UniProtKB/Swiss-Prot annotation:
GO terms for biological process: spermidine biosynthetic process. It comes from Moorella thermoacetica (strain ATCC 39073 / JCM 9320). InterPro entries: PABS (IPR030374), PABS_CS (IPR030373), SAM-dependent_MTases_sf (IPR029063), Spermi_synthase (IPR001045), Spermidine_synt_N (IPR035246), Spermidine_synt_N_sf (IPR037163). This is Polyamine aminopropyltransferase. Homodimer or homotetramer. Keywords: Cytoplasm, Polyamine biosynthesis, Spermidine biosynthesis, Transferase. The gene is speE. The active site is at D156. It comes from the Bacteria. Belongs to the spermidine/spermine synthase family.
Amino acid sequence: MRGIWFSELQTPDLAISVRLNQTLHHEKTPYQELAVVDTEAYGRMLLLDNIIQTTVKDEFFYHEMIAHVPLNTHPNPRTALVIGGGDGGVVREIVKHPSIEKVTLVEIDARVVANAREYLPEIACGLDDARVEIRFEDGIEHVRQRENTYDVIIVDSTDPIGPAVGLFSAEFYRNVYRALKADGVFVAQTESPIFNSRLIRRIQRDLKEIFPIARLYLTTVPTYPGGLWAFSLGSKKYDPLEVDWRQAPKVATRYYTPAIHQAAFSLPPFVQEFLEAPEEEEF
């Protein structure tokens, strides 16, 4: 294999490797190691602590599915909070919705936003929308201090290691419930159903104790571990399987459609199996 290759060790026994054209930027921020690289296969790629966060080639699978599912589940979302997501991809999708009046992006690391703006403009372009407020602070604390504030809350976090662990806790989900308005909707990325089944099962059980409606849905993300990714949704009122598509806005997407929205909640048997398994059982 000629050239320089980057490998992300996704599990102790699995790595994904891509050939690099060049490293565009590298630094150690106050919070993490950050790099932007240009690759043969996926174009420009954002790495945090040597973990692939997003790529120009496949980012739309993830960003469209984490954003449009909750935004179309809620019939009239006006205020949205994004925790994490400093690359701007989720915000870009949110501001496509005409009902949105304000988006608050809470990102702890200002350098992520700065580098996304410079090196990933096609992903970060929504950050300059007049409806967007960017706050560089801790998302856990931000949610803890809010009550009855947001129609939609989206958690676009890194993996559950280090400071991000708190974003996967039952205490955080209870605070999210309080921060949502009476008919609010919440979605978080919740890792790989292939490699993180116990985590997903625990999160689903936590959400079912907190929200009247709790569901899991899936999408493909080629550069993420296993290529299949899970999102956990909690809703105070609206069921994502009962969207009135006649009223939903028509927004430009590359992956998400009403049919894919519905199909994403149709879980394969292996996922149903681990969701229903006793807590002590491993997969």
